[in-house]
């Protein structure tokens, strides 16, 4: 089934060429079904790249999804033109009276800053609080996961001695959780971050459960009981060449950076990267959409406030 996006969105053209079923607003208006309503709070600098990555995964589900793109109004983007944001994105004030089946809060390359020093932190706190009564299930990614764990549960983040950078093996802590249905015993996920959340802090919070982790990259999936909030510390949505682009960028700026682990054959950056996370990423997003959004959300979204 298609994902419904704003008319003219550049990601639509890219994904259509990949044979992902995209439906623009005009055509979607004539569909006599209620699609899932998903709002994506995009905190990444390059909005087009991130929205394309996430829409690609949402479009691989048999469910029809209606997309609303959201950006923090209190932050001035240096990488995405304001005209683009005005044309394709909404502000919180414009959607705060609506209710959504699901929400995705992306990462942001600001994890070395204290949360309180991030210019849009007060707005993000307001949005996260709003999501509790107006969104059925929220998926937090990387820095977004750290922000959510800190805001709701006081879980701190810690600086790493070196950037966690590469594709790492993960295992499951539970096998009877629907979010994890179909996952391999060992699966791979890209990570790209300078900070971490720690297991010893999370296990102190009774509302939280660690669902998956890695000996190398630490905690990966954390969920609240019932799946209303899912925290993902890695980047399963990454394209095959995203880590390469980050590595090449840092090398060009002469920044200290290690070769991403388990990514290039023989750890040789001249080789073509090996993708080992595509199956996991599609399953993670499909399971979240199906089991935690579609199967659980009330048909009448106005009932959300009572749950």
UniProtKB/Swiss-Prot annotation:
The gene is metAA. The record marks 111 as: Important for acyl-CoA specificity. This is Homoserine O-acetyltransferase. It comes from Desulfitobacterium hafniense (strain Y51). NCBIfam families: metA (TIGR01001). Keywords: Acyltransferase, Amino-acid biosynthesis, Cytoplasm, Methionine biosynthesis, Transferase. Transfers an acetyl group from acetyl-CoA to L-homoserine, forming acetyl-L-homoserine. InterPro entries: Class_I_gatase-like (IPR029062), HST_MetA (IPR005697), MetA_family (IPR033752). The lineage of its organism: Bacteria, Bacillati, Bacillota, Clostridia, Eubacteriales. It comes from the Bacteria. The active site is at residues 142, 235, 237.
């Amino acid at each position: 089934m298609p994902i419904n996006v704003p008319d003219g969105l550049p990601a639509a053209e890219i994904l259509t060429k990949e044979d992902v079923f995209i439906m623009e607003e005009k055509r979607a208006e004539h569909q006599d079904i209620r699609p899932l309503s998903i709002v994506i709070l995009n905190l990444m600098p390059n909005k087009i790249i991130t929205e394309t990555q996430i829409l690609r995964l949402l479009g691989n589900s048999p469910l029809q999804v209606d997309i609303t793109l959201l950006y923090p109004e209190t932050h001035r983007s240096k990488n995405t033109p304001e005209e683009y944001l005005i044309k394709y994105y909404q502000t919180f004030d414009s959607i705060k009276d609506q209710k959504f089946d699901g929400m995705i809060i992306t990462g942001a390359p600001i994890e070395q800053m204290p949360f309180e020093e991030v210019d849009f932190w007060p707005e993000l706190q307001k949005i996260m609080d709003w999501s509790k009564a107006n969104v059925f299930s929220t998926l937090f990614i990387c820095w977004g996961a750290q922000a959510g764990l800190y805001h709701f549960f006081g879980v701190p983040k810690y600086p790493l001695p070196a950037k966690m950078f590469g594709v790492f093996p993960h295992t499951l802590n539970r096998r009877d959780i629907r979010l994890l249905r179909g996952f391999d015993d060992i699966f791979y996920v890209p990570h790209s971050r300078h900070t971490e959340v720690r297991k010893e802090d999370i296990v102190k919070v009774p509302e939280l459960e660690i669902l998956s982790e890695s000996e190398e990259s630490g905690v990966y999936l954390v969920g609240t009981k019932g799946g209303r909030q899912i925290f993902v510390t890695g980047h399963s949505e990454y394209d095959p060449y995203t880590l390469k682009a980050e590595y090449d960028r840092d090398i060009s700026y002469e920044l200290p950076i290690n070769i991403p682990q388990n990514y290039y054959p023989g750890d040789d950056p001249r080789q073509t990267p090996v993708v080992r996370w595509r199956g996991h990423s599609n399953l993670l997003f499909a399971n979240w959409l199906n089991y935690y959004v579609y199967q659980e959300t009330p048909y009448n979204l106005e009932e959300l406030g009572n749950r």
